[in-house]
Design a protein with these regions (language model features):
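A structural signal for the principal folded core domain
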Residues: 1-417
């Protein structure tokens, strides 16, 4: 996976370094593993791992705590793991009920209860806002940036989205721009156990600071239904989609049930209006959020637009019809959602004001390459840039120093397409 500088492009493995996403599936632990469920060896061990998770510490910090304790405890045998990795591996094969997450039953299906394991979303945001270094790099208001007479768009708070969002709220309030990231993850080498973590961060935080591990919070784990022999049936697939969106409703509703929310920053109450601005995930995950079909072979495979797959190679920009809340909800209400590659399931995000879930999702490079869309995106980009900017980009590419493993498009950006 590539190591990106932008949080918007961060890959799943970057998240997997930070805290507890390697746990076994709460719902799909195999019977033989249930028989061998363990507990932490002692209270000190349990307290350490709870501290590690609660404060979203990285491995380096956790190991420093262990080293400090062992040095000053004067105990012949340390009650702590030799390092944080050992503690995480132990949690891979044990019951994690002691960790500071609550659970809520979201579905009872075929005599089995499915739970959302979660931290309250307000608590996650409060944890971010309690970090003094994050607050130093926290933006409250839209910023209009210019250089040499040209408008600059460097962060979301300098773009039109923020400007328009700010105009829609009370004058003394502030926008709280929320990023959601989720991805179903296999947690064992055999691929038999999986989890569906969901994370939260804030686009109010400058990008370089947001890329650090402590600038994101694990909101919880979404349930993964046991398919057994019905995984391919339309009824089961619909139930899985409904469960996903019901889980999101449970997690996110507390942000939208009031006239904005007060959060304390530097001992002052600041009035915010939360807005979900970005949903990060791969292409199948984007399909789950937007409830479009999860197949590149479906007639309408794009979760952004209503372009038939046979037209992807010849579509003109003026023929593209963008998906949005209004036209997708109309198909749903008419019972014809499937005719446009949409699941006949109510989308939770239709109930949230000021969010277009189809625009909030981000392009996924790998699956777009699989679909063959990338070359057309390059063509559109070239047309938008114009000849002068295309030449300028080519000149910049040409002066990039060569390095082993670094791909340089020596023939210019047009060679990519």
């Amino acid at each position: 996976m590539e190591d990106y500088y932008s949080f918007e492009q961060v890959s799943p493995d970057r998240f997997e370094e930070s805290n507890i996403e390697d746990y076994d599936n709460f719902e799909q632990v195999s019977p033989e593993r249930e028989e061998n469920v363990m507990e932490f060896p002692n209270e000190a061990y349990a307290d350490l791992m709870e501290l590690f998770i609660k404060h979203n510490l990285n491995n380096k910090t956790g190991n420093a705590i262990i080293k400090f304790f062992d040095k000053h405890s004067n105990l012949s045998t340390s009650p702590l793991p030799k390092n944080i990795e050992a503690g995480r591996k132990l949690m891979d094969i044990m019951n994690v009920q002691k960790l500071p997450y609550s659970k809520h039953c979201i579905l009872d299906y075929k005599n089995k209860e499915y739970f959302v394991y979660y931290r309250p979303i307000k608590s996650c945001i409060e944890s971010l806002l309690s970090n003094p270094d994050i607050i130093k790099n926290f933006i409250y208001k839209y910023q209009f940036l210019q250089s040499d007479g040209e408008t600059l768009y460097s962060e979301q708070y300098s773009g039109n989205w923020w400007k328009n969002a700010e105009a829609s709220i009370r004058p003394k309030a502030h926008i709280l721009s929320i990023i959601l990231y989720s991805d179903a993850t296999t947690t064992d080498s055999l691929g038999k156990s999986s989890l569906h973590p969901i994370y939260i961060s804030l686009r109010n935080i400058r990008t370089w600071r947001r890329n650090k591990e402590d600038a994101k919070q694990l909101l919880g784990y979404l349930p993964i239904l046991s398919a057994n022999n019905e995984g391919q049936t339309s009824k089961f697939k619909r139930l899985a989609r409904e469960t996903f969106h019901n889980s999101l409703k449970f997690l996110l509703d507390p942000l939208f049930d009031e006239d904005g929310i007060d959060f304390k920053i530097n001992n002052k109450n600041i009035w915010f209006f939360p807005r979900i601005s970005t949903v990060i995930g791969d292409w199948p995950e984007a399909c789950t959020f937007s409830l479009t079909f999860k197949s590149a072979n479906s007639n309408y495979p794009c979760h952004f637009c209503q372009t038939h797959r046979n037209d992807l190679t010849s579509i003109r920009k003026d023929c593209i019809i963008i998906r949005n809340k209004e036209n997708m909800q109309e198909y749903y209400n008419n019972g014809s959602a499937e005719s446009i590659g949409l699941e006949q399931v109510y989308n939770y995000f239709w109930t949230i004001p000021n969010i277009d879930i189809y625009a909030a999702t981000v392009p996924d490079r790998m699956h777009h390459l699989d679909l063959g869309l990338f070359r057309y995106q390059i063509e559109y980009t070239k047309e938008l840039l114009g000849k002068s900017l295309e030449d300028k980009m080519n000149r910049r590419i040409a002066i990039i120093p060569r390095h082993p493993g670094l791909k340089i498009f020596a023939k210019g950006v047009q060679s990519i397409a």
